[in-house]
């Protein structure tokens, strides 16, 4: 079977899974397989174009290719964020292939939209090359934003509201996927339809783009401010805007404040929150890539739901979603599955707000959090979650402030450091604690002996990144302390503090363990 035929076969399997409404284990694992073979992603682009050129293209195959690409891009993004240059280049090559095939006429706009939506789902910027190619394709077909048929747009929005059952956050997510590759002018034209819509759920969804790039957010803010003066900004939107204003730069905050003032003049005030019961609140330990998750089982009225938030060290809040209208057994099954995949611990609303505030400060000012975080925070019953930077020193000091002196004295520190060499044997979560950036290959190049490689990793990779690993360890301790096993999390907090001290890394057994796992990962 040729690689091309193999990709087609996988796509048919995914298509059938999508039609059945349930993804098979094979579909779930396709992303990892494709990410390991970047050339296969270019085949997906080519096959999507070929499907679109058929007399009767199969839209379900487009969805399948989009799913496969999205799964692979998500894996590549994670690796790229960890400094893996191969992953970064693979994503750039996919962008270039899509743009090139669009310009050559091999990839129709509808097929391209299916592929580009994968970038949006994976949390990756589409890029100007694709937007320019999309603009070119639309001009060639006479479908630029000046010629967009309003009835079609109105019908699309009506169908979107129905499919999303009026959920503004789901509407925003789905609409963002549809418009990600569109030129800014066309996006703003379509967003104006949301801002001026009769349906309040569309207007509430529109404020999500105040977290988009400035070219979108700035003119959109002016549109929404004008409608606020007309009483078209709801109380729910005012409540959401008061959260969002804390997550953006000062210039954006001024524009959002202007919307809030205009809405209040005509009587729109923050709505009273509905009673929400948080049945279970869990937090994972931080993995080697810096990822940490929060999960919550909630009840709102008669409905049960699951809230999930993903934090990424150095990148802030990467994702937030809510699965509403689930049964309690379904939620329990999902949480059981999560617990089988990672170490999770009970936590409190106060600690959740604390780590989210830290994550918001940790992200790039140019990359605000996803709009779904507003919904997640609201359903968790949190309020006024604003960016607040927390250093490792301050975090450790806070955690240890109530600990017994005997548990944190010099003797306890040495005991914790010695014990750190055994952590990997007792905590499966730590299997992910290794480096996989380009600096690893450079460090071990020309070194054949394992001990030489380990020494090089410690000296040339882990030493420059000791602050990163101190943060990973400290936030893992923060997660563990909710279980009440003081000795475990206190040991971890003490080792985190040693990581940012002047103590040689060669004296910390955990560091050697991380280096050994890094060497092993580099061999695979």
What kind of feature is each model-predicted range?
Residues 1-205, 214-229, 234-524:
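Non-catalytic terminal/accessory regions
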């Amino acid at each position: 079977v040729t690689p091309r035929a193999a990709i087609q076969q996988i796509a048919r399997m995914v298509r059938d899974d999508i039609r059945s409404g349930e993804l098979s284990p094979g579909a779930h694992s396709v992303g990892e397989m494709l990410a390991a073979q970047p050339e296969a992603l270019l085949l997906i682009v080519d096959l999507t174009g070929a499907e679109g050129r058929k007399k009767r293209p199969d839209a379900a195959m487009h969805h399948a290719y989009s799913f496969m690409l999205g799964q692979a891009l998500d894996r590549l993004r994670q690796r790229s964020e960890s400094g893996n240059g191969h992953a970064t280049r693979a994503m750039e090559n996919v962008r270039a292939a899509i743009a090139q095939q669009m310009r050559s006429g091999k990839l129709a706009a509808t097929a391209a939209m299916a592929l580009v939506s994968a970038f949006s789902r994976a949390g990756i910027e589409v890029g100007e090359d694709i937007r320019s190619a999309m603009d070119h394709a639309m001009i060639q077909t006479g479908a630029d934003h000046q010629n967009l048929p309003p009835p079609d747009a109105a019908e699309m929005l009506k169908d979107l509201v129905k499919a999303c059952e009026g959920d503004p956050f789901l509407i925003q997510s789905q609409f963002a996927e549809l418009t990600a590759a569109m030129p800014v002018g066309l996006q703003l034209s379509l967003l104006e339809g949301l801002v001026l819509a009769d349906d309040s759920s569309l207007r509430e969804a529109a404020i999500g783009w105040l977290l988009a790039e400035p070219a979108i957010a700035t003119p959109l803010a002016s549109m929404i401010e004008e409608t606020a003066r007309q009483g078209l900004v709801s109380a729910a939107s005012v409540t959401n805007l008061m959260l969002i204003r804390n997550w953006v730069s000062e210039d954006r905050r001024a524009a959002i404040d202007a919307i809030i003032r205009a809405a209040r003049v005509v009587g729109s005030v923050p709505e009273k929150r509905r009673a929400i019961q948080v049945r279970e609140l869990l937090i994972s330990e931080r993995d080697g890539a810096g990822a940490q998750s929060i999960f919550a089982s909630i009840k709102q009225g008669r409905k049960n739901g699951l809230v999930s938030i993903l934090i990424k060290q150095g990148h802030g809040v990467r994702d937030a979603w809510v699965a509403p209208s689930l049964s309690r057994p379904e939620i329990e099954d999902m949480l059981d599955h999560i617990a089988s995949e990672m170490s999770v611990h009970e936590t409190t609303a106060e600690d959740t707000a604390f780590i989210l505030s830290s994550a918001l400060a940790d992200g790039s000012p140019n990359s605000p959090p996803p709009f779904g975080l507003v919904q997640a925070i609201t359903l968790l019953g949190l309020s006024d979650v604003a960016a607040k930077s927390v250093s490792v020193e301050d975090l450790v000091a806070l955690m240890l402030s109530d600990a017994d002196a005997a548990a944190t004295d010099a003797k306890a520190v040495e005991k914790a450091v010695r014990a750190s060499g055994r952590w990997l044997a007792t905590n499966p979560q730590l299997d992910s604690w290794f480096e996989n950036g380009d600096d690893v290959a450079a460090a071990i190049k020309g070194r054949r002996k394992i001990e030489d490689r380990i020494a090089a990793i410690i000296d040339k990779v882990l030493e420059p990144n000791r602050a990163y690993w101190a943060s990973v360890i400290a936030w893992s301790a923060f997660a563990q302390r909710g279980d009440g096993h003081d000795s475990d999390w206190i040991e971890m907090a003490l080792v985190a503090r040693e990581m940012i001290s002047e103590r040689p890394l060669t004296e910390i057994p955990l560091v050697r363990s991380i280096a050994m796992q890094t060497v092993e990962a580099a061999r695979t």
